[in-house]
Amino acid sequence: MSQSNRELVVDFLSYKLSQKGYSWSQFTDVEENRTEAPEGTESEAETPSAINGNPSWHLADSPAVNGATGHSSSLDAREVIPMAAVKQALREAGDEFELRYRRAFSDLTSQLHITPGTAYQSFEQVLNELFRDGVNWGRIVAFFSFGGALCVESVDKEMQVLVSRIATWMATYLNDHLEPWIQENGGWDTFVELYGNNAAAESRKGQERFNRWFLTGMTLAGVVLLGSLFSRK
């Protein structure tokens, strides 16, 4: 399960980087070949556990880690959906989400003013705000889109070392905090049924689905305001 979620994260981030003309492999090599951090580039605020992909989240721990408890039927059902279909649905939903909220995302990433020493703290606090009122599919799409935007912003600002770290943070958060909800709500196969075949774009004229996206956008607006506060610190 953990490996599957990691695969989804890497595919989505690779896709977002490729849209800007970047290659995933060139940035993962940066982290793998990095044996020692230059003096002064790491902040005490970013703990070793965060760097190694085992962050200590401030959200309350879920009673079912990785969705392994009491969800065997959901896990079995998920295997019916090809991983490629989940990846494609995530890509399409992410594109549609960013199309609708392009300005908000641009404001958010530019206002965070991330550095290698503060990136993890900003990442964590934005997600705490994003999922403060609970989890839904729209917010999960926003989660992926935020991670992609953060990776692109990192590369644009010549902080390539953050790309693989962001992927690890996302996979860890997905496993520990989102996977239980995903399995309780039909697994990724349900996501594909709802958002596959470019359904997010096709549903733009449908009021019910539009309202779901709109509520996600309202949540994102709160994240943008939070980002503005971070920029002053």
Swiss-Prot record:
Motif BH4: where in chain: 4-24
InterPro entries: Apop_reg_BclX, Bcl-2-like_sf, Bcl-2_BH1-3, Bcl-2_fam, Bcl2-like, Bcl2/BclX, Bcl2_BH1_motif_CS, Bcl2_BH2_motif_CS
GO molecular-function terms, A-Z: channel activity
A Pfam family recorded for this sequence: BH4
Region ranges (Disordered): 29-71
Key words of the record: Apoptosis, Cytoplasm, Cytoplasmic vesicle, Cytoskeleton, Endocytosis, Membrane, Mitochondrion, Nucleus, Phosphoprotein, Synapse, Transmembrane, Transmembrane helix, Ubl conjugation
Motif (BH1): 129-148
Locus of motif BH3: 86-100
Statement: the UniProt record of this protein carries the keyword Membrane: yes
Comment text on domains: The BH4 motif is required for anti-apoptotic activity. The BH1 and BH2 motifs are required for both heterodimerization with other Bcl-2 family members and for repression of cell death. The loop between motifs BH4 and BH3 is required for the interaction with NLRP1.
Name of the protein in question: Bcl-2-like protein 1
Organism of origin: Sus scrofa (Pig)
UniProt lineage: Eukaryota, Metazoa, Chordata, Craniata, Vertebrata
